[in-house]
Amino acid sequence: MTVLHWATISPFLLAILIPFLYKYARRIHTGWFVLVLPLVLFIYFIQYLSITSTGGVVEHTIPWVPSLGINFTVFVDGLSLLFALLITGIGTLVILYSIFYLSKKTESLNNFYVYLLMFMGAMLGVVLSDNLIVLYVFWELTSLASSLLISYWFHREKSTYGAQKSMLITVFGGFAMLGGFSLLYVMTGTFSIRGIIENVDLVTSSELFLPAMILVLLGAFTKSAQFPFHIWLPDAMEAPTPVSAYLHSATMVKAGIYLVARLTPVFAGSAEWFWLLTGFGVVTLLWGSTSAVRQKDLKGILAFSTVSQLGLIMTLLGLGSAAIYFGESVDPAFYSFAIMAAIFHLINHATFKGSLFMTAGIIDHETGTRDIRKLGGLMAIMPVTFTVSLIGLASMAGLPPFNGFLSKEMFFTALLRATEMNAFNMETFGIIIVVLAWIASVFTFLYCLIMFFKTFTGKFKPENYDVKVHEAPIGMLISPVILGSLVIVFGFFPNILAYTIIEPAMQAVLPTVLADGELFHVNIYMWHGFNAELFMTMGVVAAGIILFLMMKNWAKAAFYMKERDPLNWFYDSSLSGVITGSQFVTRIQMTGLLRDYFAYMIVFMILLLGYTMFRYDAFAIDTTNVTEIAPYIWVITIVFIVATLSIPFINKRITAVVVVGVIGFLLALLFVVFRAPDLALTQLLIETVTVLLLMLAFYHLPELRKEEFKPRFNVLNLIISIGVGFFITAIALSSLALGNEAGIEPISQFFIENSKELAGGYNMVNVILVDFRGLDTMLEVLVLGIAALGVIALIKLRMTGREDV
């Protein structure tokens, strides 16, 4: 394995050690041990900047299941490096923050950091994997780890509810995405992302193109909380704040963004890709921003703001995909500008949203509440928290001189350029997208005002809090201060990211737009003069202030709408319906009778086999090679059939047991006739022991005054029995007939020819069981051994007098 492979899986390796560190080093906060890893990984990945900034790619492969085209291939290009740096960099700050946020005395830190490391490793696997199946495995691990982190405080009902919702929605999307990956393999013959991009013509010309696209986007939309799948994200805020700052602002919710960006070279250029991304992105942007203003909880506001910002990035990726559609017919920088804005805002969002989640956690930690109706006047009490929050909110609102202003202006520029597009009906619908995005920006500015004024201004009321409010300790402030500082640095000096981060990432998203050696020439600057984008920003500020001042007039109606979210109602109703339906089916099926369970399995087998044989016209009988049946075999068979048919009509249990034993002995006799003495001996032993055990069981049963009972005739059982006999016979005869027709020798011929040669045995039955099916037999013996151990344990427990056994 290469160093890059070890770096990818290193969080999983450290997670194995965490329980031991937690147990034997209780005096040291477990987070200090964990902190070292993401910091080292961040420094390790920084060294790749010199490679990716010149267009280089690093790739290493370890075969996993090469026969199926599945290999553990890790590769670093501009896009994967951007996400790797976000995962490890933000991860370092989040773990540092968690050390002071979570008490080592009261919290189960071993669980928390195991889950967090598992999530970090899964995210690294997602962004560094070249193989789609490996990516899918890590993708589902992110869902699992996220669910565990959300339900970290599992004693809270809302935590488990949020974890379940997150798991169900994202795993549903993951399964759909796996279907899309499978279709891509069918079209191209490879699971390699780079291989698929190289064979993109095979994808675009296939009739499976659209189904694959929709399935892949289902995975991306559910993971990145796009409308209408966004409903899991607000409920995920029940997780500890370090989890919210990490998973739901900088990493997990960006996994869908990564997938869309990574597969843009495959699907971009089609109207369906353009409109699915742009349409769902704009709706998500608008829905998230309007929902945020209706929240009363700080983390609730930030959750919906995250939904909104993810919609913004998705919209930009959709608009930027036009660069591949137009190719060299227009200036590459014209539409690729949207991709540049998406990447830049991806970074900006991680900085300002991460800092805001942390300050929200600080406020909750130090005041005991996140309810904006109780908060107020914290500006003087918590000056550092106030300063960091002000920077983050100003950036999120799109105010200069912060980085959020730059990416918001770039967003407006991309929207206006899209209206000039003479494709995808943008000449008709382009202005609608601009208007919806502008309205969403107004509400974005509005919820930033609400957070700021409701939390930090006004009169401080100590009676609203159960604790004495004070500023957070310095250790808890370090991480949000660093992120807040980056907001300012990237605002004043955005081009420090231009050729090291943004340019290489753009080349990975749009590899076919430029000729070899050409660059996108990323250049971001603050002042563009008095243009349409600036006037749009001024309009956003003015409209946002007016709505804030008129808040008393519309707030009551907005909060009323919040309590009646149709999407959450639909989810809850659907889940309740599934549970009710499952309980109904369970009551019908789980009768506690073994014969019913056998009937279910047998009926399913009959239906499946019957459909298959009728569907493919597989019924055939060939009597040319049928061996003549000897008279004594006829006698044995007739007695066998008569004994079997008599069982339902016997009204004494002991007699029925004896007849069943007779059937077993007749079967053993047939084995002797067909020269299988070992099978005959085994059958004789089994039947003898079974009959004796049943007789012994009758001895220990309670005494019954009347042993005889009246047998009941069941038509359904008769139909099932006839169906099984018919189809098993039909399969046997059809297999022989079709095999003879196709010139295929029966499989028994192989064992006849190779039993002595390959296994050194003359008894084919023994050779099959011990050699050709040796592994199967070994596992059967293992199962029997486990069952025997279980019986011994039960007997010993019973002998000790345990009444609960």
Curated annotation (Swiss-Prot):
GO molecular function terms noted in the UniProt entry: antiporter activity
GO biological process: proton transmembrane transport; sodium ion transport
Name of this protein: Na(+)/H(+) antiporter subunit A
One CC-aspect GO term: plasma membrane
Coiled-coil features, chain-numbered ranges: none
InterPro entries linked: CPA3_Na-H_Antiporter_A (IPR050616), MrpA/MnhA1/PhaAB (IPR005663), MrpA_C/MbhD (IPR025383), MrpA_C/MbhE (IPR046806), ND/Mrp_TM (IPR001750), Proton_antipo_N (IPR001516)
Family of the protein in this entry: Belongs to the CPA3 antiporters (TC 2.A.63) subunit A family.
Sequence intervals crossing the membrane: 4-22, 29-51, 80-102, 109-128, 132-154, 167-189, 209-231, 244-266, 271-293, 300-322, 332-354, 375-397, 431-453, 474-496, 529-551, 597-614, 629-651, 656-674, 679-701, 714-736, 778-795
Subunit composition and interactions: Forms a heterooligomeric complex that consists of seven subunits: MrpA, MrpB, MrpC, MrpD, MrpE, MrpF and MrpG.
Topology of this chain in the membrane: Multi-pass membrane protein
Disulfide cross-links: none
Function as written in the Swiss-Prot or TrEMBL entry: Mnh complex is a Na(+)Li(+)/H(+) antiporter involved in Na(+) and/or Li(+) excretion and Na(+) resistance. Na(+)/H(+) antiport consumes a transmembrane electrical potential, and is thus inferred to be electrogenic. Does not transport K(+), Ca(2+) or Mg(2+).
Metal-binding recorded as keyword: no
Organism: Alkalihalophilus pseudofirmus (strain ATCC BAA-2126 / JCM 17055 / OF4)
